[in-house]
Regions:
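Short hydrophobic beta-strand element within catalytic cores of glycosyltransferases
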Residues: 103-106
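Conserved donor-binding/catalytic core segment of Leloir-type glycosyltransferases
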Residues: 1-14, 20-23, 36
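Nucleotide-activated donor-binding/catalytic signature segment of Leloir-type glycosyltransferases, i.e.
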Residues: 48-66
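Aromatic "clamp/platform" in nucleotide-sugar-dependent glycosyltransferases that forms part
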Residues: 86
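A charged, aromatic-enriched C-terminal amphipathic alpha-helix characteristic of glycosyltransferases
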Residues: 142-172
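Conserved acidic donor-binding segment of nucleotide-sugar-dependent glycosyltransferases
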Residues: 119-128, 136-141
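Short alpha-helical donor nucleotide-sugar binding micro-motif in glycosyltransferases
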Residues: 65-66, 73-78
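Short glycine/serine-rich donor-binding loops of glycosyltransferases
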Residues: 91-94, 112
Length: 175
């Protein structure tokens, strides 16, 4: 089975219900996919209930809170990472996923959407687009491999010193 993962706090800010809704749509048309919700938070019970009501509990796994090495083990065992955040000043987890060679789907509302070129971006509320992106990444190996390779190159080139130099150049042009 392919594994599609949500990893983060299970809170309203992170948009876990959109992940579940998109997963439900994918599972209506596609077999051989498992979904993982890794983390904990005040919406955990609500998400477990939603998964049960959607009748997809047999394809869903809740890990609870992960730390340190467990996070990277989870990412490395994933085929796709999804960050459907409603509000996210930056969001470093897609970079961690991409560094592990895992293509990412992120919300356009996250800060990292402004800098990542090789992640698929959807509006957090557009569960149809999110489901389409999930389906595409597990169904089209060429697309998956392209985003895996380009994403890895992209995150390996994100260096704080380069970002600082670019920021300084912008500042110098303005002054």
């Amino acid at each position: 089975d392919k594994v599609i993962t949500f990893l983060g706090r299970i809170t309203m800010q992170k948009g876990p219900e959109y992940f579940v809704e998109a997963a439900h749509k994918v599972l209506q048309h596609t077999d051989g996919i498992r979904f993982v919700m890794a983390g904990n938070g005040d919406m955990m019970d609500k998400m477990i209930d939603l998964v049960a009501r959607k009748r997809i509990a047999d394809r869903f796994h809740f890990t609870g809170f992960l730390r340190g090495r467990q996070v990277y083990e989870m990412l490395r065992s994933s085929d796709v990472y999804v960050m459907p955040s409603v509000s996210e000043p930056f969001g470093i987890s897609p970079l961690e996923a991409m560094q592990c060679g895992v293509p990412s789907i992120i919300s356009k509302q996250s800060g990292c959407a402004e800098i990542l070129r090789y992640a698929i971006k959807t509006d957090y509320w557009d569960v149809d687009a999110m489901a389409d992106a999930m389906h595409a990444l597990v169904s089209y190996p060429t697309l998956h491999e392209h985003l895996k390779q380009k994403g890895l190159e992209e995150v390996n080139n994100i260096v704080w010193s380069k970002a600082g130099l670019r920021l300084r150049a912008i500042y110098d042009r303005l002054v």
